[in-house]
């Protein structure tokens, strides 16, 4: 039996749930350069589903859906342009890994904070885990327009660094078989990514 202590609306409650430790749980990591639409995609996915903001472990904020036993890592507050794991502490990765290793719930996340080689290789080595890595692609000219539209102040050096990071991940031999790439320039393409998430996280 797993016991999760979570905070919901500042009221401390305990959730007791029987869970089969041998079940195959899903971890889906969504990455892409800044402006590829990760946060917008996740807000769309959460529409018409009931999620509660919780803190299942120290430093670890998430949105929890009981029906799917699904944690979306990070913060998603109204009106915030930057959300997801990018809103978490720079030091969050050890806490996230410790928590995930002791639970077999489903995990979905986006953002740069833990979308890195060490975390993905950690997830790849977890028992009874179906890991999927989704990479969003958007043409450079579309990205540049999106940066202008949202008033992004991220430097060219920062953006080049992120591009190099993702190129290295895409060429990582150990991770290749887990990666699915999607274009994400319009609503139709966004819908295909959401359909992928729905299929892999269905009840």
Features from the language model and the residues they span:
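NTP-dependent small-molecule kinase module
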Residues: 2-5, 10-14, 171-203
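Conserved nucleotide-sensing/catalytic segment adjacent to the nucleotide-binding pocket
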Residues: 66-113
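Conserved glycine(s) of the Walker
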Residues: 37
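Conserved phosphate-donor/acceptor-positioning beta-strand/loop module used by diverse small-molecule
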Residues: 111, 128-147
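A conserved segment at the C-terminal end of the G1
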Residues: 40-51
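The conserved Walker
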Residues: 34
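Hydrophobic anchor at the beta1->P-loop junction of P-loop NTPases
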Residues: 30
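Short beta-strand-centered segment that lines the nucleotide-binding/catalytic pocket of NTP-utilizing
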Residues: 51-65, 73
